[in-house]
């Protein structure tokens, strides 16, 4: 197998939750460029259908917090590559977080990943092959400052252990499960922080490379984990943060 072949996804079916915008859109585009037929599963019908059309893929409207909805889609699609990327952010001090906001963040960012793995994983395991990548965050490894976001951080830390646990369970079935942990990236989710100099200056001061990541850089790392080039990698959280967590 050539180097190009090891990174190719030709002939494979990929499903990307939260794949319509931001990092998810970059992942969808990168997997398609690598040869996969991509199904974008997202709540944003307008952006999702438009991107799927450009990529020659498919769009499904999906709420990852609804397990039954995930299971219904899984009855129709058994992907070779599964990317659980859907996520939201919420900034509030712990002593002020409304319990409903806490539950919403956990429901999307942690339970949504579980629902995705639980719905699509069994058929992949039964088939004996597949690659799953879940979007975590450097915030699942370290607390960040100055923005308060305990719910987000807790959810992403949960994703890391969910990935490791599931990877161990599925390792001998031929299904690999890994996570990507982006640092500060130039997407809509970081727009609020980037517009606040008192936050953004701290972000850049504490990022050794001194810049934001680009969605494409995160997507390229996802492609690696999905590809045959990562065939002996499972249960890993790959941090792509410009050196933030190295300090």
Language-model segments: which ranges?
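Active-site helix of classical SDR
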Residues: 117, 155, 163
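Short, small/polar-rich loop/turn modules that mediate ligand/substrate recognition or access, typified
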Residues: 171, 176, 233-235
């Amino acid at each position: 197998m050539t180097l190009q072949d090891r990174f190719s996804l030709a002939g494979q079916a990929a499903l990307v939750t939260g794949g319509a915008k931001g990092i998810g859109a970059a992942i969808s585009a990168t997997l398609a460029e690598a040869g996969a037929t991509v199904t974008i599963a997202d709540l944003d019908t307008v952006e999702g259908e438009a991107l799927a059309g450009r990529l020659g893929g498919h769009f499904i409207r999906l709420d990852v917090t609804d397990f039954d909805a995930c299971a219904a889609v899984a009855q129709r699609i058994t992907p070779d590559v599964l990317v659980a990327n859907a996520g939201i952010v919420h900034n509030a001090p712990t002593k002020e977080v409304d319990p409903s906001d806490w539950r919403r963040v956990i429901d999307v960012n942690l339970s949504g990943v579980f629902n995705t793995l639980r719905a699509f994983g069994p058929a992949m395991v039964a088939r004996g092959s597949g690659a799953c990548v879940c979007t975590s965050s450097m915030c699942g490894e370290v607390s960040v400052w100055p923005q308060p976001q305990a719910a987000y951080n807790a959810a992403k830390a949960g994703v890391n252990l969910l990935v490791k646990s599931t990877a161990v369970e599925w390792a001998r079935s031929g299904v690999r499960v890994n996570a990507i942990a982006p640092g500060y990236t130039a997407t809509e989710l970081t727009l609020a922080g980037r517009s606040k100099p008192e936050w953004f200056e701290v972000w850049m001061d504490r990022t050794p490379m001194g810049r934001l990541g680009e969605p494409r850089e995160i997507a390229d790392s996802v492609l690696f984990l999905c590809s045959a080039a990562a065939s002996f990698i499972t249960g890993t959280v790959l941090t792509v943060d410009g050196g933030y967590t190295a300090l």
